[in-house]
């Protein structure tokens, strides 16, 4: 796979292992911290898992993706910070980022500005047992699915030739991005089943009254 946008001569300040280790540690702390705090709220296991997901995805959208969107000179900085180097590393799997391709810029922009805050609103809604938490989860999950599908589809329509090697293509582009198809799909399906059950129960009660 050719990679016309990849700055091949760029040297990272952090090694790939160090980047993944620190990034993995930060994600682990978010998940474990959310799990621990949610346990103090006497939430069911399913709700606690959802809280972990929504806290994690919300912070990723706002911090990591927001940094990419609002830092136009990210790939020109000669002394990039940790988040910038994460994007430089991820660019090995999808070089559209270094060129600030309009498709990824639009998708990441919506994720940072809209889906990130809404994901954190879901956290609040679950903790406070708000009635709108389910419909909000469904809506944000569908939006994430839509964004992920656009992300893959736009790459496919342009030749799907943006990775520096097959390894980075499957590990970064496919592997990491697929999370926003798998998890939102599971949440949306679960909500759909619950809504069907509620509607069926309502129809049965209505039939008895008639």
From Swiss-Prot:
Record pathway: Secondary metabolite biosynthesis; terpenoid biosynthesis
State whether keyword Lipid metabolism applies: yes
Please give the InterPro entries that the UniProt record associates with this protein. EBP (IPR007905), EXPERA (IPR033118)
GO CC aspect terms = endoplasmic reticulum; membrane
UniProt keywords (A-Z) are: Isomerase, Lipid biosynthesis, Lipid metabolism, Membrane, Steroid biosynthesis, Steroid metabolism, Sterol biosynthesis, Sterol metabolism, Transmembrane, Transmembrane helix
Q: Which residues cross the membrane?
A: 17-37, 50-70, 107-127, 135-155, 172-192
| A Pfam family it matches | EBP
Q: What does this protein do?
A: Isomerase involved in the biosynthesis of limonoids and quassinoids triterpene natural products such as ailanthone, chaparrinone, glaucarubinone and amarolide, allelopathic degraded triterpene lactones inhibiting the growth of other plants, and possessing antimalarial, antifeedant, insecticidal, anti-inflammatory and anticancer activities. Catalyzes the conversion of 7,8-epoxymelianol to isomeliandiol via skeletal rearrangements.
Reactions that this protein is recorded to catalyse: 7,8-epoxymelianol = isomeliandiol
Q: Which topology term describes how it sits in the membrane?
A: Multi-pass membrane protein
Where does the record place the EXPERA domain?
Answer: 46-188
The subcellular location is: Membrane
| Gene Ontology MF terms | C-8 sterol isomerase activity; cholestenol delta-isomerase activity; steroid Delta-isomerase activity
Single biological process term from Gene Ontology: sterol biosynthetic process
Family per record: Belongs to the EBP family.
Query: Which protein, by its recorded name, is this?
Result: Isomeliandiol synthase ISM1
Q: What does the record give as EC number?
A: 5.3.3.-
